[in-house]
Swiss-Prot record:
The lineage of its organism: Bacteria, Pseudomonadati, Chlorobiota, Chlorobiia, Chlorobiales. It comes from Pelodictyon phaeoclathratiforme (strain DSM 5477 / BU-1). InterPro entries: EFG_II, EFG_III, EFG_III/V, EFG_IV, EFG_V, EFG_V-like, EFTu-like_2, G_TR_CS. It comes from the Bacteria. Residues 8-291 form the tr-type G domain. The keyword Nucleotide-binding applies. Catalyzes the GTP-dependent ribosomal translocation step during translation elongation. During this step, the ribosome changes from the pre-translocational (PRE) to the post-translocational (POST) state as the newly formed A-site-bound peptidyl-tRNA and P-site-bound deacylated tRNA move to the P and E sites, respectively. Catalyzes the coordinated movement of the two tRNA molecules, the mRNA and conformational changes in the ribosome. This is Elongation factor G. Pfam families: EFG_C (PF00679), EFG_III (PF14492), EFG_IV (PF03764), GTP_EFTU (PF00009), GTP_EFTU_D2 (PF03144).
Length: 704
């Protein structure tokens, strides 16, 4: 199958937003207008195409990043009538699913940031925005739900500037808001667009309504000033009062958008079919193609030398696996983004993370949960492979003759865990395998066994995250399980640096064991994890035993010295040691490393840490006092408050341990009128009284 469009006519985009901003409906409309759908689904009736898991249809939220492809010919702008391929990843808006957002942003070249014209910039908008900044993803902003009572386009633009620190530049201003939203003024062409009242998919082009002419002129001047700052030629023309063409404005806007120095802003109401076609024109006009993004950087798996791959079909094949999913019909699906070269179905690829070669049986182009077999996939495309057994999220797939490791994705550690046990013997046999499959799909979901109780523990990013995974066990894997109460994932660290000797000796006839190490144990800054440095001089410990010391330290870190929780943010330096010609072994040095670390950590002022959550509560005025009092009673620290969309909002940092059951308490406190969102912020030291209680619990467990 030949390439359908040139590479510069490809757009890999994501739809990113807060929950309820209208992402799934907007994506449905895109598919409808681009000819992929013949009937539009609605989220509220569970018929939306991109929400393809049962739980998504029931809950009306998007959990997995469904991928789809479609084609669009712009009606206006520099690309009129030129066919473009748009690959869309629909990302979730609930904070428990930030991993889905993170991995989709890693492989995108641009994004449409959706905002609700009533709610404005919500907490999850900020979270997703920060993630997009991290990857330098160019964005356009689409202010949706303009037909809703309380819609305010200009307030939302102001909030994008103030809360996100962005530079939003409206290319349209609305004609009417709320129930009287009728269309918009195109500030580049200085024309009015009035949508058909019965069906917003058709519209009339008119002169700008008389009562909006002054406002439109003001906003056009604002737009031209903002755009001309990014191009000297345009600035000179603007200052000299010369005419500036549409094409010139669009060209400079495109360059500024690609550098993320301008965010073009559009408006619409996807549910009423208003604005989506113009948003598609803007996707083509202003967002990046793989050619604009340029070469991808990586390194050679053996030599660590830097390697670059140009976005060309002629280059050796290189792709990043960004998502693993289990499909009930075809089995394991590996979604991947091709950065260079071409891949044919049936060919072999090298996974440079495992060093293994695997055959790709089939290549599928995904349309939400429907799939289409294709012969080959080209540079810049997103597709799914069937038949890859050992691939994990973030692995690089490439041509075995030109190996490369692309940048590895980094995911946050889980903050909440629950015990899980099978209901029956047959469930018991399948539970382990099913949990392993789910963990393979989701890097923020971890499965482990409690060493003391033998219980299986599952850990994730929040209560909803784990609830949905347990639900999937039942629906997809037919495994019934009982779950315990959620537990906080406490951690331990140290506050000062110490040196300590770890010695393991067993010499009582026959071959003995001997290993002696001197370690320096010191704190690292928060979030750095673990670092091991070998500073041994003069061969006092043979090279082959040093990895064993590191392994012993890491083993000891899994169960801390305060209350048995995993330790983090620690640097361990191996300074000195001794070995015995006959009795030393890897095992002896592993145990010596473990003893040395435990002894050092106990003297290094060890402390207990707890996860602190960033919480935002939106509440009617009359419940504000109760909400703030309640947050304070949960050891919360109020960080700010204000007014938004006719309600009060409160920002606070609260320990996760105090937030279990909060949704029920908030509902009863506000008669169901307040809502909240919560995301992990950082780990902080636990107050002494709580630390003592946890230590006591640990001691009583040990004595049992």
């Amino acid at each position: 199958m030949a390439r359908l469009v040139d590479l510069d006519k490809v757009r890999n985009i994501g739809i990113m937003a807060h929950i309820d901003a209208g992402k799934t409906t907007t994506t449905e409309r895109i598919l409808y207008y681009t000819g992929r759908l013949h009937r539009m689904g609605e989220v509220h009736d569970g018929g939306a195409t991109m929400d393809w898991m049962d739980q998504e249809k029931e809950r009306g939220i998007t959990i997995t990043s469904a991928a789809t492809t479609c084609f669009w010919m712009p009606k206006f702008g520099n690309y009129i009538g030129v066919n473009h391929r748009i690959n869309i990843i629909d990302t979730p808006g609930h904070v428990d699913f930030t991993v889905e957002v993170e991995r989709s942003l890693r492989v995108l070249d641009g994004a449409v940031a959706l905002f609700c014209a009533v709610g404005g910039v919500e907490p999850q908008s900020e979270t997703v925005w920060r993630q997009a900044n991290k990857y330098g993803v160019p964005r356009i902003a689409y202010i949706n739900k303009m037909d809703r009572t309380g819609a305010n386009f200009f307030e939302t633009v102001k909030a994008i500037r103030e809360r996100l620190g962005a530079n939003p530049v409206p290319l349209q201003i609305p004609i009417g808001e709320g129930e009287i939203f009728a269309g918009f003024v195109d500030l580049i062409r200085m024309k009015g667009i009035i949508y058909n009242k019965e069906d917003g998919s058709t519209y009339d082009e008119v002169e700008i309504p008389h009562d909006l002419q002054n406002e439109a002129r003001t906003w056009r001047i604002n737009m031209l000033e903002a755009v001309s700052e990014h191009d000297d030629t345009l600035l000179e023309k603007y200052l000299n009062g010369e005419d500036i063409t549409e094409s010139e404005v669009r060209n400079v806007l495109r360059q500024a958008t690609l550098k993320v120095t301008i965010i073009p802003v559009l408006c619409g109401s996807s549910f009423k079919n208003k604005g989506v076609q113009f948003m598609l024109d803007a996707v083509v006009e202003y967002l990046a193609s793989p050619v604009d993004v340029g070469a991808v950087e990586g390194h050679h798996p053996r030599t660590e030398e830097p390697v670059t791959r140009e976005p060309k079909d002629e280059e050796p094949f290189a792709a990043l696996a960004f998502k693993i999913a289990t499909d009930p019909f075809v089995g394991k699906l590996t979604f991947f983004r091709v950065y260079s070269g071409v891949l044919k179905a049936g060919s072999y690829v090298l996974n440079t993370m495992t060093g293994k070669k695997e055959r790709i049986g089939r290549v599928l182009q995904m349309h939400s949960n429907k799939r289409e077999d294709i012969d080959c996939v080209y540079c810049g495309d997103i597709a799914a492979a069937v038949g890859l057994k050992d691939v994990r999220t973030g692995d690089t797939l490439c041509d075995e003759n030109s190996p490369v490791v692309l940048e590895k994705m980094v995911f946050p550690e889980p903050v909440i865990e629950i015990a899980i046990e099978p209901k029956t013997k047959s469930d018991s046999d399948r539970l382990g395998m099913s949990l392993a499959k789910l963990a393979e799909e989701d890097p923020t979901f971890k499965v482990k066994t409690d060493d003391e109780t033998g219980q299986t523990l599952i850990a994730g990013m929040g209560e909803l995250h784990l609830e949905i995974l347990v639900d999937r066990l039942k629906r997809e894997f037919k495994v019934e399980a009982n779950v315990g109460k959620p537990q906080v994932a406490y951690r331990e660290t140290i506050r000062k640096s110490v040196e300590f000797e770890g010695k393991f000796v067993r010499q009582s006839g026959g071959k003995g064991q001997f290993g002696l190490v001197v370690l320096r144990v010191e704190p690292l800054e928060e979030g750095k994890g673990y670092e091991f440095v070998d500073a041994v001089k003069g061969g006092v410990i043979p090279r082959e035993y040093i990895p064993a010391v590191n392994a012993g330290v890491q083993q000891a870190m899994k169960s801390g010295v305060v209350a048995g929780f995993p330790m983090q943010d620690i640097k361990v330096t191996l300074l000195d040691g001794k070995y015995h010609e006959v009795d030393s072994s890897e095992m002896a040095f592993k145990i010596a490393g473990s003893i040395g670390f435990k002894g050092g950590a106990k003297k290094a002022d060890p402390v207990l840490l707890e996860p602190i959550m960033k919480v935002e509560v939106v509440t009617p005025d009359e419940y504000l006092g109760d909400v703030m009092g309640d947050l304070s009673s949960r050891r919360g620290h109020i960080e700010g408050m204000g007014q938004r969309a006719g309600a009060q909002f409160v920002n606070a940092k609260v320990p996760l341990s105090a937030m279990f059951g909060y949704s029920t308490d908030l509902r009863s406190m506000s008669q169901g009128r307040a809502n909240y969102s919560m995301e992990f912020d950082c780990y902080r030291e636990v107050p002494r009284s709580i630390a003592e209680a946890l230590q006591e619990k640990r001691t009583s467990k040990d004595s049992d």
